[in-house]
């Protein structure tokens, strides 16, 4: 019986406690003039994630999206959304936890953020905006590689100065 209890404690657990919109901003700095011009936008998406420990095994993950649409040289709209979630995560190694917070949780939050951006753009009376899916696993792997390269460079610099 004690063996079963130990196995249950080591079993990874992942629960979504809450998904919510933390911050929203939508600006059309050049309206109404922007509506009078031919619509040929250049859309740029910037995204960022951050996480914070709220309690033992409870984390907040925030996915920030900034979408800028320029029509020629003028900004047509600027949309910023911070989509957040509170996640209870237990039984993972440090590396697995980092991956969950940096890739898995943002992957859960992205559809909510994408829907919010699309809704705001529509309310601004701009044509429908469909954001392409994001490969958060690849972005997280790139982030880990950059950190490792930075640590190696710092170690080499330290050795050279010693």
Curated annotation (Swiss-Prot):
One of its GO terms (cellular component) is cytoplasm. Transmembrane segments: none annotated. Gene3D superfamilies: SecB-like. It holds the Pfam family SecB. GO terms for molecular function: unfolded protein binding. One of its GO terms (biological process) is protein folding. Keywords: Chaperone, Cytoplasm, Protein transport, Translocation, Transport. It comes from the Bacteria. InterPro entries: SecB, SecB-like_sf. It is found in: Cytoplasm. Its main location: cytoplasm. One of the proteins required for the normal export of preproteins out of the cell cytoplasm. It is a molecular chaperone that binds to a subset of precursor proteins, maintaining them in a translocation-competent state. It also specifically binds to its receptor SecA. NCBIfam families: PRK05751.1-4 (NF004393), secB (TIGR00809). HAMAP family: SecB. Homotetramer, a dimer of dimers. One homotetramer interacts with 1 SecA dimer. Belongs to the SecB family. This is Protein-export protein SecB. The lineage of its organism: Bacteria, Pseudomonadati, Pseudomonadota, Gammaproteobacteria, Alteromonadales.
């Amino acid at each position: 019986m004690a063996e079963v209890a130990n196995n249950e404690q080591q079993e990874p657990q992942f629960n979504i406690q809450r998904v919510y919109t933390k911050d929203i901003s939508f600006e059309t700095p050049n309206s109404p003039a922007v509506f009078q011009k031919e619509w040929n936008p250049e859309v740029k998406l910037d995204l960022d994630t951050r996480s914070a420990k709220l309690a033992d095994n409870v984390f907040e993950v925030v996915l920030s999206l900034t979408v800028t649409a320029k029509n020629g040289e003028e900004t047509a709209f600027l949309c910023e959304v911070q989509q957040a979630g509170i996640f209870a995560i237990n039984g993972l190694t440090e590396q697995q936890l980092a991956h969950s917070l940096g890739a898995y949780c943002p992957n859960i939050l992205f559809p909510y953020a994408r829907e919010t951006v699309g809704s705001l753009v529509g309310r601004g009376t701009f044509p429908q905006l469909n954001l392409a899916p994001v490969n958060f696993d690849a972005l997280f792997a790139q982030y880990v590689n950059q950190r490792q390269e930075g640590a190696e460079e710092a170690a080499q610099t330290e050795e050279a100065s010693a």
